[in-house]
C-alpha cells in the first residue's frame, strides 16, 4: 500500500510516527508555547529528533513544553527554545541571524505559529496583524535561513481550509481601503502561506529542498480565543457545504494530536516528491488551487512589502 494511503483524518502524531527513528534530525518548529506547536514538538522529540522550538514568550514556552522535554529525554531527543516574535521584523532578523551564526543545518522547518480572526491591529512594523504574523513573519524568517536547509530538507507551512475565505490582496494588505473583516484577513494570510510553500518549492527543489502547505483540521486550541464559538460553527458549516458540493467529506472536530498529525506526516513520513509544492490535509495530498502567475505574483509582492518595510 502506498504510504499516502495509510493514514487519514483520525490519525494521531504518534500513530503517524510509529516506528520512526528521528535521531540525528534537527527540526525547527515555530509557536511551541501552545496547542499544535507543543504537540508537534513533543511527537518529534519523542521519536528522537532535536527540536528547536521558537516562541515569543519564552517563559510561557518553558512551562508549556515540560512534557516535551520529558518525552524527549526518554527517546534520545532534545528541545531547545529560541526567542521569536513573528510580528516584529527586528526580532525575526535577530533570531535568523543567531541561527545562521550557529551554522547548524535543519532537516525540517515547520512554520506552525499563527493567530486567527484577531481584532484589527498592526504588527510592530505596521502590517495588518494576521497577514504580518501568519505569513510575512515566516516569509522573512524562512528566506533568511534558507541556506540552513540542505539537500533532503523540507519546509512545512501551516495553512488552513480558511484559505477559502479570501485570495491575497497585496494592493490593500493593511485594509486601508477595505472594511476589516477578521476571517477575510485570516483567509488572506492562509492563502499566502500556501502560495509561499509552492513558490519556495519551485525555487529550491533543484537543490533537493521541498516545501508543502498543510491544513491541520478544525481543532479547539488557543488559536480561536478571539472568536465566538457560534461564529466558528457557521464558518465550518459553510466550508462543509462547499466540500459536500465537491463530493468531499465534511469537517469533523479533531483532537490536538490528530490536528498535528498532518504536519509530522509531511515533515518525515510522506515521500518528498509526493508532497513537494502541494497542499495537504488529513495526511493526504490535496488539490492544486493556484496557477503559476498567482504564485509568482504573490511571492514577488511580499518581497516588495519587506523591502518597503526596511526603508521606513
Q: Which residues does each PLM region occupy?
A:
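Active-site rim elements
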Residues: 181-187, 247-253, 292-300
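Generic hydrophobic secondary-structure packing signal
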Residues: 37, 57-60, 189, 255-262, ...
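Short, amphipathic alpha-helical "lid/cap" segments that border enzyme active or binding sites
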Residues: 93-96, 256-267, 299-310
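Rossmann-fold NAD(P)H-dependent dehydrogenase/reductase core
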Residues: 2-232
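SDR active-site lid
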Residues: 202-292
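Conserved C-terminal active-site "lid" loop/helix of NAD(P)H-dependent oxidoreductases
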Residues: 278-312
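Generic low-polarity alpha-helical segments
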Residues: 2, 92, 131, 241, ...
